[in-house]
Design a protein with these regions (language model features):
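C-terminal capping/lid segments that line or modulate ligand- or cofactor-binding pockets
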Residues: 1-58, 294-297, 352-353, 359-365, ...
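Glycine- and aromatic-rich loop/turn segments at beta-sheet edges
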Residues: 274-291, 320, 326-342, 383-418, ...
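Catalytic cores of carbohydrate-active enzymes
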Residues: 241, 258-263, 385-399, 421-425, ...
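Short, positively charged low-complexity motifs
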Residues: 555, 568-569
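Substrate-binding groove/exosite segments of carbohydrate-active enzymes
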Residues: 232-371, 378, 495-511, 544
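Terminal accessory carbohydrate-recognition/targeting modules of carbohydrate-active enzymes
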Residues: 1-255, 569
Length: 570
């Protein structure tokens, strides 16, 4: 399978995850729609690490498999040279004691079912009697389950997902395993005799089921009833079928560039969540800014993901993003998804309406969808103005007091230039215009002339204010507008303008706000000369701040590329 082949990581991979994830770069690559491993511990046979269901649960391993004989516990050690970490499955080989080897292939199915298949081989000349134990902190209550018409032992458990968004019902079973217990703690146990020179197959299946995803129960029972080879083949085929059905064909001559594209597609799938949780958070599929880091559907980066996901043949993720953001924002400016309440839940500067309108043009849809999107886009524009638009009297412009609202944090050097005061109108006004413009266009297509006129008039007002207040005639570029500066910045005729610029000051070009008649092109194209000399905005690496200006007012992270220009899935 192509994606497995091109993206597989062999052996121990290098990488520095900073404060999150795995320092060795060996994050488990397969995941379910909501169940995944926030960290991975390959030394644990099964699924070791910090188990996550839409967010880390902080309760440790999902499942452990241990071995013992009459003399006591058997030590296991991975042969890391045999490790292959592929998008659909993870495989490796372990030594068990002194004369046994264990081949492991494990995966997490789309429907939140984690399967560990094992082949235990005896290298000695004598039969070996072994006890295999499998335990999970999430499933400790013994019971029975019917698999392929026959009863077998099952362990179950219940817990709440982070922030109490849903209830998880864990279910675990294994081929030939029975319940064992000690001090009120229960696990699965199986005694096996591995013949001299022979092998024994083992399998443990655990699922996180919920009321809102009945498919998890169906797939749990299905994989519990499959043989090892059947289970692995089914996972590989079904996981990779997604790519065959969804990816547009792109032929890139340079293999390194092609791999980067493939990896980006994989990132969009890995950094997504389809938990189907009722309410105003994860009720629709969403993309996440780094499931191993921020782990939030932060509104700032939703349009960046959408620029990718709109090209998938299935609209489930692209439209899931839009419907989730629109519904969660409740008739106001687009808001961070509230599902992760440890994060900011703010109305950041973002261009989701512009990207959403582009997605609608690519994917298509009916009048009902267009009506919803127009409503969301329009209320994002008016909501932004309600939240941040009361600082410049008589103008339809938003202003921020904090540099992180732009997404570039301290590298928004114009926001902390000396003498600029507290509030600044910045390049995110382009996105407010784009939201009003997108709403107007959709209402025009729907034939709703009243709403179309309302948002067209609003877009025109924003455009007029931007062109009048934020264009520096002296410097021939768009600049940040200090609402109440403590002194003239650099232009006596336009004393509110700040000369220091970032890539965000060019948002007006990106969204199409800048007029394109002949006279306007002649005038405004002068601003683009900053990209021509390689000193202000180098091609690579691409910096957030104008690097000439950054020498005068340094940002904290000059090497961080702007999210708008070089978006990442996390």
């Amino acid at each position: 399978f192509y994606m497995d082949r091109i993206l597989a990581r062999e052996g121990v991979c290098s990488g520095n995850a900073g404060s999150n994830g795995n320092a060795d770069g060996n994050t488990f690559l397969t995941r379910g729609r909501a169940l995944y491993m926030y960290t991975s511990s390959p030394s644990v046979i099964g699924f070791g690490g910090n188990t996550a269901y839409h967010q880390p649960l902080g309760r440790g391993d999902l499942v452990r498999v241990l071995f013992s004989n009459a003399d006591g516990s058997l030590t296991t050690k991975e042969d890391t040279s045999k490790r292959v970490n592929a998008p659909s499955n993870w495989s490796s080989t372990y030594s068990v004691g002194s004369n046994l080897t264990l081949d492991v292939v494990k995966f997490i199915h789309q429907e939140n079912v984690a399967v560990t298949t094992m082949t235990l081989t005896n290298k000695s000349a004598e039969d070996q009697a072994i006890t295999v134990a499998a335990d999970s902190i999430f499933a400790t209550e013994p019971g029975k389950v019917t698999v392929n018409g026959a009863e077998q032992t099952e362990l179950t458990g219940t817990c709440s997902s982070p922030a109490g968004l849903t209830t998880i019902y864990a279910r675990m079973t294994g081929d030939g395993f029975e319940a064992a217990s000690s001090d009120d703690y229960c696990w699965l146990s199986r005694d096996v005799t591995v013949p001299a020179g022979g092998s024994v197959e083992l399998k443990v299946v655990i699922a996180f089921t919920t009321e809102e995803i009945p498919e998890s129960t169906e797939q749990y029972l299905r994989f519990a009833g499959l043989g090892n080879l059947e289970a692995v083949r089914a996972q590989k085929a079904e996981y990779n079928l997604y790519w065959a059905e969804n990816l547009p064909y792109i032929d890139v001559p340079k293999k390194a560039v092609q791999k980067a594209i493939d990896y980006r597609w994989w990132l969009e799938r890995f950094n997504s969540l389809d938990a189907n949780i009722p309410g105003y958070d994860y009720q629709s599929p969403v993309t996440i800014e780094g499931v191993l880091g921020y782990n939030n559907a932060i509104i700032l980066t939703q349009p960046m993901h959408l620029q990718d996901t709109k090209w998938l043949r299935s609209p489930y993720l692209a439209y899931g993003q839009l419907l989730s953001a629109g519904n969660s924002s409740q008739s106001s400016a687009f808001l961070d998804n509230p599902g992760n309440r440890n994060n900011w839940n703010n109305h950041y500067g973002q261009y989701l309406a512009e990207a959403g309108y582009e997605a609608f043009n690519v994917i298509g849809g009916g009048a009902e969808l267009a009506e919803n999107l127009a409503y969301y886009f329009g209320h994002d524009a008016t909501g932004q103005l309600e939240h941040y638009g009361n600082h410049i009297e008589g103008r339809d412009l938003i202003a921020y007091r904090n540099n992180y609202m732009t997404g570039n944090d301290a590298d928004t050097i114009s926001m902390h230039a000396p003498g600029t005061g507290t509030w600044k109108a910045h390049g995110e006004n382009a996105y407010v215009w784009a939201a009003a413009d997108a709403a107007a266009k959709l209402y025009e297509q729907l034939g709703n002339t009243e709403q179309a006129k309302y948002y067209r008039d609003l877009a025109d007002k924003i455009k007029a204010d931007v062109l009048e207040l934020m264009w520096c005639e002296e410097c021939q570029k768009f600049e940040t507008y200090a609402v109440r500066p403590t002194g003239t910045q650099h232009n006596a005729n336009q004393p509110n303008l700040v000369k220091y610029t970032e890539s965000n000051n060019y948002n007006y070009f990106a969204v199409g706000l800048v007029p394109d008649d002949a006279a306007s092109v002649t005038k405004y194209k002068e601003a683009l000369k900053a990209f021509s000399n390689g000193k202000e905005f180098p091609i690579f690496p691409f910096y957030t701040a104008n690097q000439v200006h950054n020498q005068e007012v340094s940002g904290s992270n000059p090497l961080i590329s702007t999210r708008r220009a070089c978006s990442s899935a996390g």
